[in-house]
Curated annotation (Swiss-Prot):
Its EC number is 2.7.7.56. This is Ribonuclease PH. It comes from Brevibacillus brevis (strain 47 / JCM 6285 / NBRC 100599). Homohexameric ring arranged as a trimer of dimers. The gene is rph. Pfam families: RNase_PH (PF01138), RNase_PH_C (PF03725). It is an enzyme of class 2 (transferase). GO terms for molecular function: 3'-5'-RNA exonuclease activity; tRNA binding; tRNA nucleotidyltransferase activity. It comes from the Bacteria.
Length: 253
């Protein structure tokens, strides 16, 4: 039995609240159990200098935590004068993940900034950020479709992420903080709606793990991501038809 009573293949309750920040082109609050992240998407009519003149768009991300998102206060990174290594790694992961399902050429020379701010952390903050940032990004993109700037969403699939690991002797899905802190193996998995992998980040924290354990964790991750994408589709119900048409056209392009 897990510490919170869940089955080994069970996600924590997931809630996605769209349009959470009124000023942003796209936003949501994603809650995965007690982990809560505000995700915003901002449209910018330019690209970074290294992209200029290429005719392509760009997706980039920033990630941060409130000082009391955790059990003890963590100083803001701005007060330290630099972004920490963990934060930089997570920001790059979020950006890479979201770019994998976007047709950058179809964006034109525009940037979408994804800001993921953790307001309460109980494990899985980076994976919740990816799952929520996707929803915020879709809403921001839909605004350009609604305005006539784009004919369709420049997307080729849904995208979500979850954590898996080995706690005790059992492979489990969606680790909370207590489980993560005692896990023998910890892994983050990012996948598309078609079941393709975008990223696998796995570490034997306490001991090496077997190919059989790896396969079991991947199978659990697929179950979790299927459910997370179902939650995304429910949250995005009013843009699902437009999105489905975009995905179909991208798939046959």
């Amino acid at each position: 039995m897990r510490v919170d009573g869940r089955a080994h293949d069970q996600l924590r309750p997931v809630t996605i609240t769209r349009n959470y920040i009124k000023h942003a082109e796209g936003s949501c609050l994603i809650e995965v159990g007690d982990t809560k992240v505000i995700c915003t998407a901002t449209l910018e009519e330019r690209v970074p200098p290294f992209m200029r003149g290429g005719g392509k768009g760009w997706i980039t991300a920033e990630y941060s935590m409130l000082p009391r998102a955790t059990a003890t206060r963590n100083a803001r990174e701005s007060s330290k004068g630099k972004v920490g290594g963990r934060t930089m790694e997570i920001q790059r992961l979020i950006g890479r993940a979201l770019r994998s399902v976007v047709n950058l050429e179809a964006m034109g020379e525009r940037t979408i900034w994804l800001d993921c701010d953790v307001i309460q952390a109980d494990g899985g903050t980076r994976t919740a950020s990816i799952t929520g940032a996707f929803v915020a990004m879709v809403d921001a993109m839909q605004k350009l479709v609604d305005s006539g700037t784009w004919k369709q969403l420049p997307l080729n699939d849904f995208l979500a992420a979850t954590s898996v690991g080995v706690v005790g002797e059992e492979a489990v899905l969606d680790l909370n903080y207590k489980e993560d802190s005692t896990a023998i193996v910890d892994m983050n998995v990012v996948m598309t709606g078609k079941g393709k992998f975008v990223e696998l980040q796995g570490t034997g924290e306490d001991a090496p793990f077997s190919p059989e354990q790896l396969q079991e964790m991947i199978s659990l991750a697929k179950v979790g991501i299927d459910n997370l994408i179902h939650s995304q589709k429910e949250a995005l119900a009013d843009v699902t038809l437009s999105f489905a048409q975009s995905v179909a056209e991208e798939s046959h392009a």
